[in-house]
Every structure is written in structure tokens, then in C-alpha cells.
């Protein structure tokens, strides 16, 4: 299987735009790409991460499983909607059904690594374990990011989930000493795969494609497909 999970150190660090950029670059390189967002909350406010990924990346195979209207953690959003969360096995089988030789299957989580996505308490980390998938971690640039990133990497290592690297999801136009220092320190924790400028999601589709084409190392992207 060629499944790569995408998580963040917290909500709002840029998981969706990073997923879109990686999908766009792989798509432009001729790789067959499918993007899966197993659990999405906040759909009642018009939030649709899969639609945004499709708009930005040009990828047309976009797959979701469970959607809840309130912008809350999945467990709470499901409770408020009076709907169950899918089971861990349902999520795993759903994702496995998408994968095939030569295809890159990107799986974007909700919130951070240990947010519960399944009715049994299953998390994105659990799905990665079941799928044998590596985890790409989207990180912030500001204060607190070193601790948040280190905790996420420790949680991955505890279950022997491989970290595929880090991505700075929203690099400021005018970084200060804190951001620059953090960028160097983060690169010592795990390979820095890409640095996306703040506001990338507001680019035109054409400009986003140009940005994405060089966002990640091409050789690394090629290695993602088995």
C-alpha cells in the first residue's frame, strides 16, 4: 500500500493546504492521487476541506466517510448531530479500498494526532498503525511549536509509526527571530519536507499549482509511490 497520513500539531496549522500542495505536486508529476478525509466536522458552516483540496490541487478523486455540521471535535460533533462515528475497522477498510499499485493515497486527519475519529476511540495514529502508513506532520512556526512537535513525534514513536517529515504550513512573510530559530530547531527534530508561505490557500488555482510544483523535493515525492 502507498498511504500517507497527514496530521498537525494542532488545529489551524495548515493541514488542508499542505495536503492540497502535496496532492497538486504529485498530480502534476503524473502520479495517480486520491485524497481521503475520513471524518470532517464544521460542514454546517460551509467548511469542506475536501472541496478546498480539490479546488486548489486539481485532484478529482476526493473521498469522505463521515461529516458532521458543528465545528467541534469529532466525538462531540457526532454526539450533537445524533449520529455515530464510524468504527476503526470501517475507516481502515474504507481507506484500503481506495489504494492500488502506483497510486498515492493521502489521508488527512481532523485536528491533531490523537483526536478520536472512531467510535472505539481510534485515532489517526491507530489508522496509520493498521494501514502500515507513515505520518507527515504539519507544524506551526511560532512559540510553542517545538514542544507540540516533540510531543507529536514521541506519540508516533510510541506506536512505531514512521514520521515522513515535517511541513511548516504557514510561514510568515516577515519572520522574526522566534520563527527563524524555530525553523532551524524543527529541522533537527525530523526532515523538513516543505515550507509553505502564509496565505497560500488564497492564491489563484494557477499560482497555487506553480507554488506546489516546487514545494516538496521531487525525488522524495517519487519515493512515496510503491
From Swiss-Prot:
UniProt-listed GO biological process terms: biotin biosynthetic process
Gene Ontology cellular component list: cytosol
The protein's required cofactors: Mg(2+)
Catalysed reaction, written as an equation: (7R,8S)-7,8-diammoniononanoate + CO2 + ATP = (4R,5S)-dethiobiotin + ADP + phosphate + 3 H(+)
Enzyme nomenclature, EC number: 6.3.3.3
Residues that bind ATP: 12-17, 49, 108-111, 169-170
A Gene Ontology molecular function term of the record: ATP binding
Complex and partners: Homodimer.
Name assigned to this protein: ATP-dependent dethiobiotin synthetase BioD
Amino acid at each position: 500500500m502507498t498511504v500517507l497520513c497527514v496530521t498537525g500539531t494542532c488545529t489551524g496549522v495548515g493541514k488542508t493546504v499542505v495536503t492540497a500542495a502535496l496532492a497538486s505536486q504529485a498530480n502534476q508529476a503524473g502520479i495517480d492521487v486520491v485524497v481521503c478525509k475520513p471524518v470532517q466536522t464544521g460542514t454546517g458552516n460551509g467548511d469542506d476541506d475536501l472541496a478546498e483540496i480539490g479546488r486548489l490541487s486539481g485532484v478529482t478523486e476526493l473521498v469522505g466517510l463521515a461529516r458532521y455540521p458543528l465545528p467541534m471535535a469529532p466525538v462531540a460533533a457526532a454526539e450533537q448531530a445524533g449520529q455515530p462515528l464510524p468504527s476503526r475497522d470501517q475507516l481502515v477498510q474504507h481507506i484500503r479500498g481506495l489504494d492500488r499499485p502506483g497510486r498515492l493515497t493521502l489521508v488527512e486527519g481532523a485536528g491533531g494526532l490523537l483526536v478520536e475519529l472512531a467510535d472505539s476511540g481510534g485515532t489517526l495514529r491507530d489508522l496509520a498503525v493498521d494501514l502500515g502508513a507513515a505520518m507527515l506532520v504539519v507544524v506551526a512556526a511560532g512559540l510553542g511549536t517545538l514542544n507540540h512537535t516533540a510531543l507529536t513525534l514521541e506519540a508516533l514513536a510510541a506506536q512505531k509509526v514512521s514520521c515522513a517529515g515535517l511541513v511548516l504550513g504557514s510561514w510568515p512573510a516577515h519572520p522574526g527571530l522566534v520563527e527563524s530559530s524555530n525553523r532551524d530547531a524543527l529541522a533537527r527534530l525530523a526532515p523538513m519536507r516543505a515550507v509553505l508561505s502564509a496565505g497560500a490557500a488564497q492564491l489563484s488555482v494557477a499560482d497555487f499549482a506553480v507554488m506546489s510544483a516546487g514545494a516538496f523535493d521531487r525525488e522524495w515525492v517519487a519515493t512515496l509511490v510503491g
